[in-house]
Amino acid sequence: MRFSLLALVLLSSSYKFTYGSECGDSTIPYSLEVLSSGQPILGCARPTCFGWHSNGHQLPTNAKFFRIDQQSDGFLRDDPLAIHTFDAADPRVYAQQQASCEQEFQSLSCNPEDQWVGGIAPVMNASTTKIVAYKCCTYAPLRASIDRGVATVSGGQIVVGGEIFADNKPYAFDYISNVEKKIDSEGEIFYEVNIKRFSCLDLQKVDRSVPEILNSENTIRHVNGHRFVVHQAPTVDVETPVETGQLVVPQGVQNGQEVIIEEIVAQEGFVQETNPQPPPPPGQQGGFVQPQGFQPQGGFQPQGFQPQGFQPQAFQPQVVQNPVPAAPAGYAPMGFAPSGLQLYYCFPGDAMVNVYNGGFKRMDELAVGDWVQALDKNGSQVTFIPVQYWLHRDPKQVADFVEFTLDNGETFSLTEKHLVFVTQCSVPYSEDENINANPVPAERVNIGDCFYIAHRKKSQMYQRVKVLDINIVQKTGIYSPMTSRGHLLVDRIHASCHSETDNYSLQNTFFTNVLRWKSQIRNYFWTVEDSTNEDNIGYGLNGVMAVLDIVIPSKLM
């Protein structure tokens, strides 16, 4: 306690008359880059929902940055100088367009729910400075924001927020709410960056038929004290945009200053199941097909392999001398990931699967080698197939899940990019129907869509269940098992093992080779150990798979 008080006194006296780097009260902190020296670079942006006069002109821009060793420690994103005029009383826009910032760099953190990091005091020597002072800005609408997680950013890395889109229309904005500098046991500097999301609309692209946009509008209406809307309003013409006003920029700072980003992709090691694959269940009822082409790899323990040749051209990967601390939540500093994209594509730990001779198991109790229920291609029979490995398995990871309320009174949850098979509720049942034909990311499922669901007790033709409501919930534990077919029944729902792309042949070949390569490397250097439940093959490789699926589409496999 005495140290904290002393630190605050020192910070106040040290920075009271010092110019620092800040976004000001009319732009939002949306990115944080860390140079190899440990110096943080704060990025500021002005989206269409913040920092504007109702006449379409910018509020005065009082962002300013500090130069350390000829390097500016912040920048302004190149945003429009003007937008369409708008009615300040319109319930779709925030009545408050400006934040209230502290006068000095006087805070050790910006933790309240209605604050973001408006500025970072100059760090003249990042390697020796342990205490960093911040200028916190308060903005009341942030009370309705959603926590997106914490990114761990080390030298040469960057975390980027910004606009979140649905159908190419912005509906939210990810911002930096808090930053904490830390030093690991090896003396390496890293920053823990809290990311939050608040509703943010472009009035020229408000389409209430898009669920995300409608939800965002209702959030803003609630913040402004207005009633919700539940239907698509008639489209009306907007006013002609006014001429652009002049951007007010401090002397020596250029709007849209470019920042060179060097990305270091650090991936966790993983281990493969060491026990031999169990035989298929005896006395299997009709409909079971022995998996083809799967050869269990026993007795190895690969770790630390980093696939080469798939790095985005914009980045120059460097050798990581010390492991980069893993980000403990949904954000990770990977430059090729879209803004706001979680890197977890999984089921929650409380999801249920039916295991042969084991009854229903929670997902966090499932193990490699278990035979789990799945529907055959046409959904006419329920069969059992083996779990080959884990794409993701992290019992302590906190993540956001899309939770569907179904018309049978049950719920079903998975992360927003994970695929689930969707059908139209009105289509007649048919033994010729391909139930794998329409895999859809959870974030794209709409109220009124139907899922395929297995009978609770009978091994016969699938049923359909309708989505009645959709919510975002936060749960602890992420699990993504890979079966020999690329799909399985989770909470009796026919779901894919994949995310982004449902190209099973491509992904299975890729991950099988990764396992083999890692196995050889691991066996050469380390002792074999058993690790049935700690495999995490997929971290960092989903982007590679998305590229491969573009090069080799699933239709050609």
From Swiss-Prot:
Keywords: Autocatalytic cleavage, Cell membrane, Developmental protein, Hydrolase, Membrane, Protease, Secreted, Signal. The record marks Y345, C346 as: Cleavage. One of its GO terms (cellular component) is extracellular region. The record marks T415 as: Involved in auto-cleavage. The C-terminal domain displays an autoproteolysis activity. The keyword Transport does not apply. One of its GO terms (biological process) is protein autoprocessing. Pfam families: Hint (PF01079). Residues 287-308 have a biased composition (Low complexity). The record marks H418 as: Essential for auto-cleavage. GO terms for molecular function: peptidase activity. Residues 272-308 are annotated as: Disordered. SMART domains: HintC, HintN. InterPro entries: Dev_Signal_Hedgehog-like, Hedgehog, Hedgehog_Hint, Hint_dom_C, Hint_dom_N, Hint_dom_sf, Intein_N. PROSITE patterns: INTEIN_N_TER. Residues 1-20 form the signal peptide. Belongs to the hedgehog family. Intercellular signal essential for a variety of patterning events during development. This is Warthog protein 4.
